[in-house]
Amino acid sequence: MSIKEHVKSMVKSVILLDKRRNRINMCNRAKLRNMEMSILSSNCAGGVMSHDLGLPFRSQFVNLALRPKDFVKYLRDLDYYNSLDVIFPEDVEPCWGGGQYPVGRVGDVTIHFVHYTTPEEAREKWNERKQRLNRRICS
């Protein structure tokens, strides 16, 4: 198989997968009864689900990652941690993806803002989305 044929085959596969994903997303959107929910996830999965369901990002846990123990700790005292400001100490190193991204702390919880480039951008999005969190459903 030539390179051109191989690329053509790959493109066709991607298009078919995209069409299948779109059909699945449409079915899931039709089943969705609560359009006001907040999806809390320790990694990017919550943002992907929100996007696929056509929901706005109603959680600060979008485009970031927390270690499982930090995520559980945060959820156990959501109101307390949400009342704190995120800080970006110099002594914390990124540990995922080998890239450079801001690492913040909210109290004793470490947050890896893996899809942001600056602490300012990460703080802005964190605070903006924290305000959108639907606490009515998180109780």
Annotate each language-model stretch with its function.
Residues 1-35:
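Membrane-proximal basic amphipathic "stem/tether" segments
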